[in-house]
Regions:
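Acidic, contiguous internal or C-terminal segments within carbohydrate-active enzymes
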Residues: 112, 121-127, 133-139
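C-terminal, well-structured catalytic/ligand-binding subdomain of enzymes
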Residues: 23-124, 147, 155-393
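Bacterial N-terminal signal peptides that target proteins for export
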Residues: 1-8
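Long, hydrophobic, well-ordered secondary-structure blocks that form the structural core
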Residues: 140, 153-154
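Short arginine-rich
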Residues: 141-148
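Hydrophobic h-region of N-terminal signal peptides that target proteins for export
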Residues: 8-21
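Intrinsically disordered, low-complexity regions
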Residues: 1, 15-16, 191, 386
Length: 393
């Protein structure tokens, strides 16, 4: 693939420098077990309290895609108008190094590439999940980060894959049904034995995966998994009365659920985006039709509101029910608008469908921002420190 050689050493070095270490929880819900019949890809991002931002970009081929990440540059979550979604989790430190480490004549930083840059390449160059897997395997086996393992999910409306990769190694597995959950340990046979993670660390990661699976199952409707259940699960956190680990942690940065539409991916694929700790912000339905995010999303002031609330109120706080009630209102509203847009698209009325979706987003965005600002003001006026966030999570 000639496109693989077009990445510059400078871009690779920049991405590798900017990408922080993290401890994330992600899952894929296969279309065969989702209530909507669509693929769901969820990522909960943890790191070092760096705010998430988002923007809309165009590939060199003119394909529109949404980037959610950090520093207004790196992509940690992404979805394109082709209905292709990708996310990445940090995995284990490995017992191996990149083959070029032993070659002093090679500038090592310029021969490696971070997953955040691979994400950008996926959005720029790939139309399907299968193509994305081939690209990831290429980088994993040739140019990936030194000594560090990663796990990536890629999915389109029809197929989904999990990929474990490390320096000189990469393995892929197709998700053909059910749900698959990843935290921060590698899983696939070709690379998992190379892990340097202690048994206690692996046990903790697998505990988080098992707990997420249990909680998602509890929230099924008629035996099927829903976006609402995914959002609720993403907000669960470790507490003394609940054994094990959960997705919402002391260093949570936010979450996103991609719902991939097979019929009209460029219009009806949806990103449910929460910037800031999941308990302290709104999951906002965002259609693929928007041309750009509002400035509060890009400049991180939206996420900053959530961070301030988490610092004042702690977790399981007094405003959480109000946030959940707001989502109970806007999620069905959006679903209704999306189905109205679907009928317009079937009738060949693309302009009207796009306007309907974008107007809904603008209205719900304004309502959500107003709510978060009201909560922020109330929290400042009447501070009430919530439950202390446990140091271990």
């Amino acid at each position: 693939m000639n496109c693989l050689e077009k990445i510059t050493a400078a871009a690779a070095l920049t991405a590798a420098t900017l990408l922080p270490s993290a401890a994330c929880t992600s899952w894929i819900i296969h279309k065969s077990v989702s209530a909507s019949g669509r693929m769901l890809v969820q990522k909960c991002r943890d790191s070092h309290r760096r705010p998430l931002d988002a923007d809309v970009r165009r590939s060199r081929h003119g394909v529109k895609w949404m980037r959610i990440g950090m520093f207004k540059h790196c992509a940690l979550f992404a979805v394109s108008e082709r209905g292709l979604a990708a996310i990445m989790n940090d995995g284990d430190d490995l017992t191996v190094q990149h083959p070029n480490v032993a070659r002093p004549e090679i500038n090592h930083a310029h021969s490696s590439i971070a997953c955040a840059e691979i994400m950008r390449q996926i959005m720029d160059e790939c139309a399907t999940a299968e193509q994305a897997v081939k690209l990831i395997l290429h980088y994993g086996r040739n140019k990936t980060q030194v000594g560090r393992g990663q796990t990536m999910f890629v999915a389109d409306p029809r197929r989904a894959f999990m990929v474990d990769l490390g320096p000189g190694y990469a393995e892929a597995k197709e998700v053909t049904g059910g749900i698959i959950i990843i935290t921060n340990c590698l899983h696939l046979p070709g690379i998992e034995p190379l892990s340097r993670k202690a048994v206690t660390g692996v046990r903790s990661d697998r505990s988080r995966e098992a707990n997420v699976r249990t909680e998602l199952k509890k929230r099924r409707v008629n035996g099927k998994y829903t976006v609402k259940g995914t959002i609720e699960t993403s907000r669960l956190r470790c507490r003394k009365e609940i054994q094990g680990k959960y997705p919402c942690r002391r260093n949570s940065l936010g979450g996103t659920c991609f719902e991939l539409d097979p019929e009209f991916p460029a219009q009806l694929t949806t990103a449910y985006i929460a910037l800031g700790p999941q308990q302290h912000t709104v999951y906002l339905p965002t259609p693929m039709t928007i041309e750009q995010f509002p400035k509060e999303i890009f400049d991180t002031s939206w996420a900053d509101l959530a961070y301030k609330l988490s610092e004042r109120e702690g977790y399981d706080h007094r405003f959480l029910a109000r946030i959940a009630a707001f989502e109970e209102k806007i999620l069905p509203e959006y679903e209704q608008v999306r189905e109205e847009a679907r009928q317009l698209l079937k009738a060949g009325k693309k302009t009207e469908a796009v306007k309907l979706l974008n107007d809904c987003y603008a209205r719900q965005y304004a309502e959500a921002l107003k709510l978060l600002k009201e909560i922020d003001a109330e929290s400042v006026k009447d501070p009430l420190k919530g439950e202390k966030i446990p140091a271990e999570v």
